Amino acid sequence: MSTEIGNNTQFQATTPQEKVALEVSNFVTKNGGSLQFASAWLGNMEHESGLNPARIQSDLTFNSAWAFNPSTNGYALGLAMMDGERRVNLLNFAKEQKKDWQAVPVQLEYMWNHDGSDSALLKRMSKSSDVNQLAVDILVHWERAGTKNDPNEQIKRDRKSVV
């Protein structure tokens, strides 16, 4: 897997993570998003799943009873570690499409076009070129991370935004 970057130089993805990163980047730009957005979104995904689309929180095995129960939390899965109702909706989307939920294109299509108001939010954010602000916005508004209001995490983000 490769892509054209800049002035005719090519990037050859060799590791599984590089292949996922390139797939996400190509998806974002093909859908009108900026490379800065792709970078920020990838940073979030890397932190969440290590860019492993088959990852399940705490490296648990797949358990259908937990996975399809929207009340089950702490059983996030996929690139963005979707949990609760979002996890169930992703799984049902994949099932309706007769595709594997672990496939990167399935997860990207779901997040970009089928995740309700969160899809609209991604598309709006994807037009920005401020990678630092995007990293925070993705964390706070799209991911709705449990750490977003943690004072220590806020201090870290504030320090990074000053640098």
Protein language model annotation of sequence segments:
Residues V162-V163:
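Conserved small/polar residues in nucleotide/adenosyl-binding loops
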Residues M45-S49, M125-D150:
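Acidic helix/loop microenvironments that form the catalytic cleft of cell-wall polysaccharide enzymes
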Residues L22, N26, K30, S39-L42, ...:
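Solvent-exposed, polar/charged alpha-helical surfaces in well-ordered, non-transmembrane soluble domains
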